[in-house]
């Protein structure tokens, strides 16, 4: 099953991740761990890092346990489930990383990207869509003076599409992880998954059976050697 493969792969990855600075458990006694799962309602002052420190957990363990779109996408009044402690808390592997993007159009689409809090042109291009900053900025300046300036929330950006190109889409039962994990598994981008699932942020459900089904684009490819960029 896809989910099992993803979860086991992440477990192996977490085993080699660096521990959170305040909780070095290099010589770990499983019997000393707090294995109680609880919930926590975030405040406007919280980040994934403050929550992790508060409960002595790995930020990535919390993000994946709550099936978040992005570990850093956290705001007031999120009801987060706090996972049991583990010997190797993960503080690194779930975060979006800057890509050395060369693409100037998006294979297969979609055409629109809806902004969320914290989005900038640079973050959308290099961290979420794996496209050059210039290709996104040219068509989505929206009055911002810098690629680092935060964009208004819930604004649709027109993203250049490669023509001709195609994506296939598949339903995916999102029972564990973050969008970065799914993007790596299906060889797609976080931004494309976000664009297909605009109403989803994270899951409060403790049950895998009640976890969300999301739409994942996969197999995105150009259909010709020479493509045009269309808005």
Swiss-Prot record:
One of its GO terms (cellular component) is extracellular region. It is found in: Secreted. Glycans are attached at residues 30, 34, 77, 100, 130, 201, 226. PROSITE patterns: LYSM (PS51782). It comes from the Eukaryota. CDD domains: LysM (cd00118). Disruption phenotype: Show no significant difference in the expansion rate of lesion diameters in apples fruits. Residues 1-19 form the signal peptide. Residues 38-82 form the LysM domain. It holds the Pfam family LysM. InterPro entries: LysM_dom (IPR018392), LysM_dom_sf (IPR036779). GO terms for molecular function: chitin binding. Its main location: secreted. Secreted LysM effector that might have a role in sequestration of chitin oligosaccharides (breakdown products of fungal cell walls that are released during invasion and act as triggers of host immunity) to dampen host defense. Belongs to the secreted LysM effector family. In plants, chitin acts as a microbe-associated molecular pattern (MAMP) that is recognized by lysin motif (LysM)-containing plant cell surface-localized pattern recognition receptors (PRRs) that activate a plethora of downstream immune responses. This is Secreted LysM effector LysM13.
């Amino acid at each position: 099953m896809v989910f099992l493969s993803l979860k086991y792969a992440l477990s192996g990855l977490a085993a080699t991740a660096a521990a959170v600075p305040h909780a070095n458990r290099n010589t770990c006694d499983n019997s000393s761990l707090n294995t109680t799962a609880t919930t926590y309602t975030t405040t406007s002052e919280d980040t994934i890092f403050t929550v992790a420190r508060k409960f002595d957990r790995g930020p990535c363990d919390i993000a994946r346990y709550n099936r978040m779109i992005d570990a850093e996408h956290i705001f007031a009044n999120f009801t987060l489930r706090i996972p049991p402690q583990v010997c190797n808390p993960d503080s690194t592997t779930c975060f979006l990383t800057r890509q050395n993007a060369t693409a100037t159009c998006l294979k297969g689409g979609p055409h629109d990207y809806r902004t969320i809090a914290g989005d900038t042109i640079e973050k959308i291009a290099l961290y979420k869509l794996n496209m050059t900053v210039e290709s996104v900025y040219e068509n989505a300046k929206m009055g911002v003076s810098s690629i680092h300036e935060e964009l208004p929330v819930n604004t649709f950006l027109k993203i250049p599409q490669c023509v001709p190109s195609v994506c296939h889409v598949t339903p995916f039962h999102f029972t564990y992880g973050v969008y970065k994990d799914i993007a790596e598994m299906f060889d797609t981008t976080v931004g494309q998954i976000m664009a297909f699932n605009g109403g989803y942020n994270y899951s409060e459900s403790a049950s895998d059976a009640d976890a969300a089904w999301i739409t994942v684009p996969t197999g995105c490819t150009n259909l010709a050697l020479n493509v045009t960029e269309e808005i």
